[in-house]
Amino acid sequence: MEKINFKIFDMWDISEIQIVDPGLRGVINLEPKLILKSHGRNVVKHGQTKVNVVERLMNKIALTGHRNKKHRIELGRSTGKYSRNMKIVLDAFQIIEKKTGKNPVEVLVRAIEKISPRDETTIIEYGGARYPQAVDVSPIRRVNLALKNLVHGASDKAFGKKKKLSQSLAEEIILAYEENGESSALRKKKESEAQADSAR
C-alpha cells in the first residue's frame, strides 16, 4: 500500500525537513498530517513528543496572556478557539513564505533550534538559605520554552497596536531564524544562559 504524504495545511511538504540539533531530534515531531488537531489524545507524560510541532505552536497561542503562573494580559486576538489560532499560524506561515521564499515549517524548526535555551537556573534550599543553581534544560522543556518565548514575544509586539498577531508572529519567527538581536525569544535565551553561567 502506497504511503500518503500529507502536507501541512495541504500547502507545505515537511518530508524533507531535517532536525540539525541532535538534542531535539526525539522531541520535535514532524509527522505529516492534513489536520493538526490531536483532540487531547497525547495528554500523558512525554506525550508532547507525539504532537506535531506546528500544533504545539497553535496550542501555545491560546496562552499568550500568561506570564509565569498568572494570567496578566487580556489579548482578545488569541483565545482558546482552535480555528482562530490555526488561522493566525496559517497567515503567519504565508507571510514567512512570502518574505523568505522558504518552507515556513523549516524556518520554524530552525528558529526553535536557535532559541531553545540549554541552561537555566533553579533554586535549592540549603541550611535555610536559598541559592540559585545552574541546571541543564531537558529537550522537551527546551522546545516548550522556545515556543512560549516566540508566542509571548509576538503577542507583546502586537499588544495595543494595529499590527495583527499573525504579522508579529511571522516577524518573530523570521528574526529568531536569522538570529537577529531584535528577537525577544533570542534575548530570553541569552538571558537564561547568562544567569545559569553566573550561578555555577
What do these predicted regions represent?
Residues M1-M86, L90-R200:
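Strongly charged
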